[in-house]
Amino acid sequence: QHYSFNRYADIDGITRVYISKTLLKAIIKSENPAMKISGNKVNLNNKELLSKMDGILVLTGTNTRIANMMHEDATKLSHTKEYEHILYRNEKELAIDVFTRESKGVILEIILIDKTDQNNRIIQLMGQFTPDDILSMIKI
């Protein structure tokens, strides 16, 4: 079971976008299946990668209080056994945390927390991934 961000479904000050597996299949069939999320920081730039996804959820906090609340909630993942904190980078041009949940050597969920600007974003990718998939998505 993936981490639920449902508490943010109806909160004022949060933009919530979900892309289903069905829509991802349509994107794969298009001539240019590239998707960029959170500016140019997360690139989902090939059919093979998109075909591994079961869904994408993007939450953007549109004010500082909400953005901080989202960030605090998401970083609680590092205190659980199910999630591993695999990447932390904090520079002016890129400030991200990446968490993964895996089972039997397969990464089932990737959660990226983008703190680069005042509008924190949480990007949740569900599917079946490899470590190389993560490296292809994120500019490190």
What are these regions (language model features)?
Residues 67-69, 108, 139-140:
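Terminal interaction module
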Residues 71, 75-102:
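Short Gly/Thr-rich strand-loop-strand
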Residues 3, 37-38, 59, 107-108, ...:
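Localized chelating/binding microdomains
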